[in-house]
Amino acid sequence: MKFLLFMFVGVVHLLPLASGKAIYGNGPSQRTFQEIKEEIAHYGDVAKSIINLTVYGKAQNRSYERLALLVDTVGPRLSGSKNLERAIEIMQQNLKGDGLENVHLEPVKIPHWERGEESAVMLEPRIHKMAILGLGSSIGTPPEGITAEVLVVTSFDELQRRGPDAEGKIVVYNQPYTNYSAAVQYRMEGAVEAAKVGALASLIRSVASFSIYSPHTGIQEYQKGVPKIPTACITVEDAEMMSRMASRGNRIVVQLKMGAKSYPDADSFNTVAEITGSKYPEQVVLVSGHLDSWDVGQGAMDDGGGAFISWEALSLIKDLGLRPKRTLRLVLWTAEEQGGVGSSQYYQLHKANSSNYSLVMESDLGTFLPSGLKFTGSDKARVIMEEVMSLLQPINITQVLKAGDGTDINFWIQDGVPGASLLDDLYKYFSFHHSHGDTMTVMDPKQMNVAAAVWAVVSYVVADLEEMLPRS
């Protein structure tokens, strides 16, 4: 019954697109959906060649090995750090050495924050040293630290109800984890909301799908007119323990010390490379990932994997001697973790040409075994993407789902450009996200091969179609 329903919905959805009416393109170049479908079907052999090269051939494991070399050599790549600067220099050399075209750096001013030494110790009801990670842009504590009683809450609503109890205390958030989007607001806004009710500092339960006593960092934002207070993430285990203690009526006292400090903005770069289009070089399909990371772990998963399968996509296409009609542009963003700073400045620099962008792609949710593609665009563009994804039937990755947005491509999507991202294992991703556990040990070379194949097939075919993806 489910199959019949799917078939019925699919037929209804495609009727106006496949009825023979010339609805794609403008003027005499208008084509029916059936004609475009037949055009895409002709890429079957090209798709198989890309898959064979990366999954089974001489390019297998290449993206993994390239990534391992960079992160083992450079380490984590915090915005404003020497490590990030070195990684950008290395990647520029790598892309030139790979024979890609128009390799260059585009200057960006980025935030520079350092965490310094940090610690948290529970003094009452017992002595317990707590693992913490200060949040990006947080201020530090005085040198002697902040020693105060704790108020544990599970939501902003509870904090508002108990506001008078928070004054002069450290607010601990033990918000439940249902999904990242719901929980991350406590990391982003927890300090501001705690400061509004007179708290001295805030400690937030790490935004993680799983924990082995691992704190997870990330960016947080202060609000104009609200006092700035120190803020850090603690482990799921410590947040839950203090919540249990509070429910028993225990008095909890914590000493927090943080040496965090912000510096003037630093100079950085977005890293760009291309395969120039053969027929419409001014038109662009963009593939991307971010090169910066947090200062813990290696930044292998977030977002080394996404950056390196994006590089690999161009490498595979070049290795096969392919040159699409449109320009394939690789951008490795800087300072994504500080709120998409590099991609924002790129958009400001290039937005006058947004009508020439056929598709923007971002990989920043893991490069494990993808189950499909998330896509944002018009209905006409979506059915085209469904046909493109059907070319990946040999590796059984054909789904097209909604919500293809991402921090670094949202500017373009809001401007009407279709956007795409990989659909991946989010439970695994948020187990290691922004933590000491984000290392090469998390990565799997065979899974990266498959992710790279998907990225290369989609980007090449869309770049080589006779027409750009239709917009709303």
From Swiss-Prot:
Its main location: endoplasmic reticulum. CDD domains: M28_Pgcp_like (cd03883). The active site is at 336 (nucleophile). It holds the Pfam family Peptidase_M28. One of its GO terms (cellular component) is endoplasmic reticulum. Its EC number is 3.4.17.-. Glycans are attached at residues 52, 61, 179, 353, 356, 396. N-glycosylated. The secreted form is modified by hybrid or complex type oligosaccharide chains. Zn(2+) 2 binds at residues 302, 337, 434. It is found in: Endoplasmic reticulum; Golgi apparatus; Lysosome; Secreted. Transmembrane segments: none annotated. Residues 1-20 form the signal peptide. GO terms for biological process: peptide catabolic process; proteolysis; thyroid hormone generation; tissue regeneration. Carboxypeptidase that may play an important role in the hydrolysis of circulating peptides. Catalyzes the hydrolysis of dipeptides with unsubstituted terminals into amino acids. May play a role in the liberation of thyroxine hormone from its thyroglobulin (Tg) precursor. Homodimer. The monomeric form is inactive while the homodimer is active. This is Carboxypeptidase Q. The gene is CPQ.
